[in-house]
Amino acid sequence: MGYSVVAGAAGRLLFGYDSFGNVCGKRNSPVEGAPLSGQDMTLKKHVFFMNACNLEVKDRGRGPMALCVSSCPEKQLDTLEEVQLFANINGSFLCVYSLNSFNYTQSPSADRLCPRLPVPPSKPFPLFNRCIPQTPECYSLFASVLLNDADALHRILSGIMAGRDTILGLCAFVFALSLAMLFTFRFISTLLVHIIISLVILGLLFVCGVFWWLYYDYTNDLSTELDTEKENMKCMLAFAVITTVVTVVLLALIFTLRKRVKLTVELLRVTNKAISRCPFLLLQPLWTFAILVFFWVLWVAVLLSLGTAGTAQVMEGGQVEYKPLSGIRYLWWYHLIGLIWTSEFILTCQRMTVAGAMVTCYFNRNQNDPPARPILSSLSTLFCYHQGTAVKGSLLLTVTRIPRVIFMYIYSTVKERHSAWPRGEFRCSYCGLWCLTNYPYHLNQDAYAAAAINGTDFCTSAKDAHTIISKNSSHLTSVNCFGNFIIFLGKVLVVCFSVFGGLMAFNYNRALQVWAIPLLLVAFFAYLAAHSFLSVFETVLDTLFLCFAVDLETNDGSSEKPYFMDPGFLSFVKRTDHFNNARSQGHKNSLPNEEGTELRPIVR
């Protein structure tokens, strides 16, 4: 991160720069060998291309001549006299800096140092702060050369920066929607669950239909000539296929579990009753969300620095070109891994904090005298003793997700070929990797709760949790999955609304933005934000069942060894289908505990 900030120059991407190494809108330092560099461009914030209608693809290491100007010419300028008048009135000089505006009509070199006539009308656009020609024929050539000639990384970064206001607005919308979903689950009812399921079904069908409609619109648009538009079209097809598959799978699951709605509502009410013992747990996602936002802003800033890292080289005529540093342009893979790992680590710290607080509240004999400051106590334990556990757990999730990313990249290459055999192999492998990714997630959650109970390391806690859950899987797994599925539908609902808002917002500027990447960024942010808020219920639910399993192993409900569990929770589990068989198995394998009031290790 430090090297990218030092070597990069995000200002060139944010504000644009001219052909002499000057960043527009900034005070610049001189470049040795470039006499027109090092100028004060504070008042000149726009990039103007002298031959906007006659650009050619870069050759001989030189790009089109660009200048920093204070304003773009909004009307066509047909003669040098009009160019001179525009400079005198607006203070915007459209000729090379070395030529004084008084000499625009007198100097014999004016034809070479001034823009080619006629100068088309243009307007500023936030894509590198460039002056974009407004005449259709000029705009078409201008955009095709500049956008198609730029590499993929710079097109992605420019799309993010051009839509930064929209992205920030959508992030605020995601925050409000996630907060509303949090309070919806806090006061859950059968009606609310049916409403959530209905909205998820409608949202998935609507978003899926919008993706296919936009893809059809792109394929039938005869003006689709830019690489950015073609990339958007490919991404649109990928989004449409993915959303269709997800919609079909979720609809099948919803149809299968439709008769379990009443049981799920009762389970979530039990979870809310446990949360009521420690109500400040619902504020924990706010801190997590704030930390995630800070980290994501920092991550994007470093990404901008990576994309602009380069050394200034003086070319013929005193022009300056920035050559990318060898190797640093490929560090974005390393940067992407850092995004996944650090985000998972932050979310893991929240899960361990919630799990520790719930364990403290669960194993408390006197329900009328709750433990003091369980959240602060759990945070203290996390930072003092369990940082390694959080790092290992988040690393495990990251390692299992990296192969999925690699396979998606390979599949995008293989699918261009006509051989069905490699495509089928990759699809099967990807499904296997998806299952491999989801298993460690649930194993990690149980490991965090076990670490909070026993104070053991990650590997020992994961082994103990797996053992105790396996003994009680007949009733724990079947009941737990229903609640987690409804919580997952809440996350899907947040993503659907945010993606729909992004589609409506980004589609307006689709010709000049690689807006498929910002849309994917918004969807990723929406899922992580919703996951940050709603994972409180998941963590409480998983921790409750693990504590319940430990309670069954160490106590038998007698007066000598009473249960720690709430009577309402025990009554709920008894009403599940498989509880009686699991109950007898639990007594058979119960561990001795002389007093029944001291928590012993999960596995002996």
UniProtKB/Swiss-Prot annotation:
Signal peptide interval: none
A GO CC term? membrane
Q: Which InterPro entries match?
A: Choline_transptr-like
Q: Where are the transmembrane segments?
A: 165-185, 195-215, 237-257, 286-306, 330-350, 485-505, 514-534
Q: How would you summarize where this protein is expressed among tissues?
A: Expressed in colon, kidney and ileum.
Which GO biological process annotations does it have? transmembrane transport
Sugar attachment sites are N90, N103, N454, N472
Biased composition annotated in UniProt, kind: Polar residues: 581-592
Going by the UniProt record, its keywords in alphabetical order are: Glycoprotein, Membrane, Transmembrane, Transmembrane helix
Quote the subcellular location field of this record.
Answer: Membrane
Region (Disordered) location: 581-604
Q: What is the topology of this protein in the membrane according to its UniProt annotation?
A: Multi-pass membrane protein
Cited PANTHER family: CHOLINE TRANSPORTER-LIKE (SLC FAMILY 44), CHOLINE TRANSPORTER-LIKE PROTEIN 3
Q: Which family does it belong to?
A: Belongs to the CTL (choline transporter-like) family.
Descriptive protein name: Choline transporter-like protein 3
Which species does the entry assign this protein to? Rattus norvegicus (Rat)
